[in-house]
């Protein structure tokens, strides 16, 4: 079983959901970013969803765009991100690691090289945000060749045919988008049909469902689980903690530890 498969099996046995934080690697710099990831794991993160800094992130709101800019302004590249992942994997051999990034990064220099580096450094799954499931075959084949699980987004307007295709192609976990738009901790509304989407995904035997977009409070984690999700992803709320504590790493890590601990506690019934 993959690390994600093992994680969800273990959580199910404990009647817990997954809490998965998202951060942009190398924000605000390499060493501080690694300490941030150590803090996430130490305080209950079940898995990691990691972004590579990119100049034109499509799905990201202003908070994560700023994180990308900080990392890029520091001179950090894809090479530094893979170096960081290798360091994470060395210290945490069991933690599932998923990447969330744009297709442009996968093609540099080639898909094959990218997924090979993922495998070599310890990545488990990759979600390419700007590749719709209808155009996925090329990427899933390249990922599978190197033992990397492909993850796809289920949008709130997905029809039954799309849901069935997502369920067939997605491995590791299914990323259920709470609402249309870009990432943001401010916009915490979710689509009214999420319960129907979740039911349809489960009927189609999808990979475990993680709800993302606008997850910033423990109540929202509980709500996601009550709807039938297997866990929740929180990104913008975490990156905002980083943003407002750039002048104090001690304060940043302290605030982050409290947030993650509270969010993880919300996954336990």
UniProtKB/Swiss-Prot annotation:
InterPro entries: Aldolase_TIM, RibuloseP-bd_barrel, Trp_synthase_alpha_AS, Trp_synthase_suA
Active site: 49 (proton acceptor), 60 (proton acceptor)
Gene Ontology terms for molecular function: tryptophan synthase activity
Keyword tRNA processing tagged: no
EC number: 4.2.1.20
Catalytic activities: (1S,2R)-1-C-(indol-3-yl)glycerol 3-phosphate + L-serine = D-glyceraldehyde 3-phosphate + L-tryptophan + H2O
Entry GO terms, CC: cytosol
Metabolic or biological pathway: Amino-acid biosynthesis; L-tryptophan biosynthesis; L-tryptophan from chorismate: step 5/5
Sorted UniProt keywords: Amino-acid biosynthesis, Aromatic amino acid biosynthesis, Lyase, Tryptophan biosynthesis
Presence of keyword Ribonucleoprotein: no
One Pfam family linked to the record: Trp_syntA
Purpose: The alpha subunit is responsible for the aldol cleavage of indoleglycerol phosphate to indole and glyceraldehyde 3-phosphate.
Family: Belongs to the TrpA family.
Subunit and interaction comment: Tetramer of two alpha and two beta chains.
Protein name as it appears in the record: Tryptophan synthase alpha chain
């Amino acid at each position: 079983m993959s690390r994600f498969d093992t994680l969800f099996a273990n959580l199910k046995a404990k009647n817990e959901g997954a809490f998965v934080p998202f951060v942009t690697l190398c924000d605000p710099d390499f060493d501080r970013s690694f300490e941030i990831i150590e803090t996430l794991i130490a305080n209950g993160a079940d898995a990691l969803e990691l972004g590579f800094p990119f100049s034109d992130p499509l799905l990201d709101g202003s908070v994560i765009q700023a994180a990308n800019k900080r990392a890029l302004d520091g001179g950090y590249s894809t090479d530094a991100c893979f170096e960081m992942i290798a360091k994470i994997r060395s210290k945490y051999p069991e933690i599932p690691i998923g990447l969330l990034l744009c297709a442009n990064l996968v093609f540099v220099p080639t898909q094959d090289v990218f997924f090979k580096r993922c495998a070599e450094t310890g990545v488990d799954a990759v979600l390419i945000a700007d590749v719709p499931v209808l155009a996925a075959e090329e990427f899933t084949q390249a990922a599978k060749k190197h033992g990397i699980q492909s993850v796809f987004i289920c949008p709130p307007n997905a029809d039954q045919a799309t849901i069935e295709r997502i369920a067939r192609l997605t491995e590791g976990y299914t990323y259920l988008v709470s609402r249309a738009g870009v990432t943001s901790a401010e916009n915490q509304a979710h689509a009214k049909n999420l319960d129907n989407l979740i039911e349809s995904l489960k009927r189609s035997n999808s990979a475990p469902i993680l709800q993302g977009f606008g997850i910033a409070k423990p109540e929202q984690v509980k709500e996601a689980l009550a709807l039938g999700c297997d866990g929740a992803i929180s990104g913008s709320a975490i990156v905002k903690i980083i943003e407002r504590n750039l002048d104090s790493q001690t304060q940043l890590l302290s605030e982050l530890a409290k947030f993650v601990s509270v969010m993880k506690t919300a996954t336990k019934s």
